[in-house]
Amino acid sequence: MPSLQDYHVPYPAAAPGQVRKVIYLPRQNPTVEQQHLRVQIIPGRHENCDDGRLYKLTGSVTEETLQGWGYSYYVVTLGDIYAAHRSSSDPARATTFVALDESPVIAYNSKLPIVVYVPEGAELRYRIWTDDASLAQSIQQKPEAPALPQPHLVPVTEGQECPQELPRCGAPSEYVRQDYKASMLSVEEVHRLSNNTPPLIPSAVHESAHEAHAAPPLHSAVLEEHGRPGMEHLEVCPKNNGSEGREQPAEEASTLKQRSSSSSSNPRHHSANESSPSRPRLSSTAYWPQENSKTKRSPSATHKPRRSTDSAAIEETGVGTPKKNRSSSGSASNKRKAEDDVYEKTMKNFWNRARSDSPRKASASSTKSGNGSKADPVDGK
């Protein structure tokens, strides 16, 4: 810390009853000291303030000039104490610093000390003021934070094991093994493993490479082909007296057709849907895939349908046919239904006549036998 003798300035000694106080200011930029910094001198003394009120001191601060040098120094005189205002202070601290009501603000000059002569028992305080410009400049002149050192990355080759000690900034993703390659399964192997089916033999492999790598068919179609072996040979039973048809085996359907053909004498006319070779009759398995309906036909499809199966066949084919064929098949079914009704009526009349003629023939034979020959006496007369 510097002393007053370092400046080689002959400041006067303190008068009796006074004390010399010296303030040493830190060195700053000369331009900043002249334009942006100021010093406030605050003389005062400690007083007992039991009531907790704030007080001020009367007195004055006088600036004097050292003759022959031109340097300034300040002389302070303190008077009586008075209450500044009625706001309360800290009551626990009864003895407080009471400042002079006059606190002069002087220029900031770090080249010279500030010399102040105060009465004995007094205390000198000061405050340094600055404006926003100097504050901004001091912020700009602050040294920047040192840059962090770059982490040292260890080069890792393919297949190298992860070291036991990793660097602090190293990422764990740098030590990943990349020499593992899993063999991929083909589509056929995946399908075979999912369905638990044995591997394909060479004769069952497709000839085309495109078909060999194609996706397998849907599981629903596979289940229908293998889970319903007896559905191919089922046909629709014809309607009898308004009852809906039920499914029967193909052999029983063929026997029923032969019986109906032997009992009927009139020829049958078939619709365009039934007679056309391009559209085979649909059975109860019409919802199967189209390939199965072409490749696997029921043995009864080669036989020509009779009258008794016309309505059932038309109803079955009407589900999957277009609108035009459906309307034509509907008109044909109505015509055949009317013919069937006429046929049934004639057969009923025939049987009724046969039943009604049987007692007449019996009575006629009895009358004929009575006229031609004499009857034997019953009583024996």
Swiss-Prot record:
Which Gene Ontology MF annotations are present? serine-type endopeptidase inhibitor activity
Q: Where is this region: Disordered?
A: 232-381
Q: Which family does it belong to?
A: Belongs to the protease inhibitor I11 (ecotin) family.
Specify the species: Leishmania major
Q: Which PANTHER family match?
A: ECOTIN, PTHR35890
GO BP terms: namely:
symbiont-mediated suppression of host complement activation
Positions with biased composition (Polar residues):
273-292, 363-372
Source organism superkingdom: Eukaryota
The name this protein carries in UniProt is Ecotin-like protein 3
Q: Where is composition skewed (Basic and acidic residues) in this entry?
A: 336-347
